[in-house]
Swiss-Prot record:
SUPFAM superfamilies: EF-G C-terminal domain-like, P-loop containing nucleoside triphosphate hydrolases, Ribosomal protein S5 domain 2-like, Translation proteins
Name recorded for this polypeptide: Elongation factor G 2
Keyword entries, A-Z: Cytoplasm, Elongation factor, GTP-binding, Nucleotide-binding, Protein biosynthesis
GO biological process, one term: ribosome disassembly
Length: 700
């Protein structure tokens, strides 16, 4: 079967935004204009096509990134047909893992910002993730029809807060209820959309007289940005003072793909204006799979290899999401980087070194699916029948193995105990939790050895709440949930030198003998555990050194203060002794463990607590209440900003342990008029009185 769309006309894009910037509505409009669904679904009615889990429709927020394929021939219908694969990403802080996961498989992104709220805390997180994966992006300023909408204020915020380099390619005509359309700076014409056809028809008109001067200024900035893409264009621009439309598009495209600039557009998705022009910008400025460097990975011999985005290359793909579908069972979403694969083919899961048969291949449109026979380089599809694949696994040609770079997922910061309500729920709960953990790498399940309770851990209260909710809906498991527990850590502030650990058992017959001497010191924050073998002259035989390391690693799981995991320590194994007959691996494992416990007690152990970056948006009247309350929660206020249309944004760093139930108390403090967002920032040392309370609570 030949390729329907040439790969240079593919665009794999994500649509990413802060919660409530109107991202789902924007995606809906894209699907509508590209002719995929003919009745526009509104989030207000809980009917948006992309938000396909029941809870998302109830909460009106997007949780799972559904992947959808759409086709576009340009706003005027005069361009070659392009294939746009859209990955819808969630905007809520507790779901940054979903965003991270989709960034990994995208070629470009469209960042949606609210014309009133502008750049919000979550926008900064998403921007950092896009920087990390070097994703070219454009900015779409939505909700231009809302009171307080200000395109140019958001332009300033993008520069100031995100250190972005936005280049407007359209500017708005009017704002708020007077927003009527945009001026296209490439054509220097006003675009007015026809409301009766829900924006499917439009006309080019002359620029309103009062906007001509400012449009000329913005056009000049845009042309300069394009000219900077190459010496030839710059010389032409300096000589002639102008560039052709094709030259401007090429210059802006090259710089967008190099992540030097971000084309900026605007509109109101809800009122059917501007999304159509933004789709044209996706074709103009965002890369196809062949415009970006080939994907790299590790070959069988341990060397680096790469895979070109071409059909004649060996097949390679990355599984980036697992979902349970009520009709077909487990779906594995994957991005094909190279080659072709057919349904029924055997592929190698190179990450796990297992061969699997690819059953059916489905192309997804939100929650509707179309069965297809093959996928090619650049495609995004879902597979049924892969039993062992999980998020981040590489699928490839069994004759030509490669492991693409793995995704790294953050550690959970909050835990809760869950208990099934009835006996039959017990078995179902185990199954449900395992299935959910398989879908979501930032969600962990473990059993507390002391209490026997099942503990679930995740990225925030909402994250866990939604997973418990899904257990009930999808698996019919009723569970009661304990109070949230904070994921504390332990580390050291001092150094303990030459600490002995000796494990000796001599009681007739063969004994046990292991002796290790270590020096323990703090490691850099975030570096974790490091083990340095500094044994000289064979005082501990080579084969026993890994056992000492293993013994220490087992002890790291529970620190000496309150049994929390130990982080950021460096161990030097400096000396020891052994016995010809009685020494064995187990004895050295025990010696390592004993030495570490003793050294940790001597090295000023401390408890670390997770600190959260909190942003509260509040009317000015309640400012005092909000700041006082944050201080009472051991918060450190780090700054304040004015909001458009009055109100303040308070930025603070607050320990997670003090933030439980914050939404309820914020509501009563401000009569429900303030909102907040919170995300994990870093670990920091808990004050003495807090540490003592934690230790006492643990020892009860």
């Amino acid at each position: 079967m030949a390729r329907k769309t040439p790969i240079e006309r593919y665009r794999n894009i994500g649509i990413s935004a802060h919660i409530d910037a109107g991202k789902t509505t924007t995606t809906e409009r894209i699907l509508f204009y590209t002719g995929v669904n003919h009745k526009i679904g509104e989030v207000h009615d809980g009917a948006a096509t992309m938000d396909w889990m029941e809870q998302e429709q109830e909460r009106g927020i997007t949780i799972t990134s559904a992947a959808t394929t759409a086709f576009w021939k340009g706003m005027a219908g005069d361009r070659a047909e392009h294939r746009i694969n859209i990955i819808d990403t969630p905007g809520h802080v507790d779901f940054t893992i979903e965003v991270e996961r989709s960034m990994r498989v995208l070629d470009g992104a469209c960042m949606v910002y609210c014309a009133v709220g502008g750049v919000q805390p979550q926008s900064e997180t998403v921007w950092r993730q896009a920087n990390k994966y070097k994703v070219p992006r454009l900015a779409f300023i939505n909700k231009m029809d809302r009171t307080g909408a200000n395109f140019f204020k958001v332009y300033d915020q993008l520069k100031l807060r995100l250190k972005a380099n936005p280049v407007p390619v359209v500017v708005p005509i009017g704002a708020e209820e007077n927003f009527t359309g945009v001026v296209d700076l490439l054509k220097m014409k006003a675009i007015i959309w026809d409301e009766a056809s829900q924006g499917t028809k439009f006309s080019y008109e002359e620029i309103p007289a009062e906007l001509v001067d400012s449009c000329n200024e913005w056009r000049e900035k845009m042309v300069e940005a394009a000219a900077e893409s190459s010496e030839d264009l710059m010389n032409k621009y300096l000589e002639e003072g102008e560039l052709t439309e094709a030259e401007i598009v090429k210059g802006l495209r090259d710089r967008t793909i190099a992540c030097e600039i971000q084309p900026m557009l605007c509109g109101t998705a809800f009122k059917n204006k501007g999304v159509q022009r933004m789709l044209d910008a996706v074709l103009d400025f965002l890369p196809s799979p062949i415009d970006i460097p080939p994907v790299t990975g590790e070959l069988e011999n341990g060397e680096k290899g790469e895979r070109r985005a071409a059909d004649d290359e060996k097949f390679s793909a990355l599984a980036f999401k697992i979902m349970t579908d009520p009709f077909v069972g487990q779906l594995i979403f994957f991005r094909v980087y190279s080659g072709v694969v057919n349904s029924g083919d055997t592929v190698l899961n190179a990450t796990k070194d297992k061969k699997e048969r690819l059953g059916r291949i489905l192309q997804m449109h939100a929650n509707q699916r179309e069965e297809i026979k093959e996928v090619r380089a650049g495609d995004i599809a879902a597979a049924v029948g892969l039993k062992d694949a999980t998020t981040g696994d590489t699928l490839c040609d069994p004759q030509s193995p490669i492991v693409l770079e793995r995704m790294i997922f953050p550690e959970p910061v909050i835990s809760q105990a869950v208990e099934p309500k009835t006996k039959p729920d017990q078995e179902k709960m185990g199954l449900a939790l395992n299935r959910l953990a398989q879908e979501d790498p930032s969600f962990r399940v473990q059993t507390d050895e002391e209490s026997g309770q099942t503990i679930i851990s995740g990225m925030g209260e909402l994250h866990l709440e939604i997973l418990v909710d899904r257990m009930k809906r999808e698996f019919g498991v009723e569970a009661t949930v304990g109070k949230p527990q904070v994921a504390y850590r332990e580390t050291i502030r001092g150094k303990a030198e030459d600490v002995d650990g000796k494990f000796v058992k001599q009681s007739g017959g063969r004994g046990q003998y292991g002796h290790a001497v270590i020096t323990l010191e703090p490691n850099e924050q975030g570096k974790g555990y490091e083990f340095l073998d500094e044994i000289k002259g064979g005082v501990i035989p080579r084969e026993y050194i890994p056992a000492v390391d293993k013994g220490i690693q087992e002890t790291l799981k529970a620190g000496v203060l309150a049994g929390f995991p130990v982080v950021d320590v460096k161990v030097h194994l400096t000396f020891g002794s052994y016995h010809d007959v009685d020494s064995n691996e187990n004895a050295f494992r025990m010696a390592g463990s004993m030495a570490f416990k003793e050294a940790m007690r001597k090295a000023q152990p401390v408890i670390l607590e997770p600190m959260m970056a909190v942003e509260v948006e509040t009317p000015e009247d309640y400012m005092g209440n909000v700041m006082g309350d944050l201080s009472g929660r051991r918060g450190i206020v780090q700054g304040m900003d004015d909001m458009v249309g009055g109100g303040k944004i308070v930025r603070a760093e607050v320990p997670l342990s003090e933030m439980f139930g914050y939404s309820t108390s914020l509501r009563s403090l401000t009569q429900g008029r303030a909102t907040y967002t919170m995300e994990f920032k870093h670990y920091s040392e808990a004050p003495r009185n807090v540490s003592e309370a934690i230790i006492n609570a643990k020892s009860k």
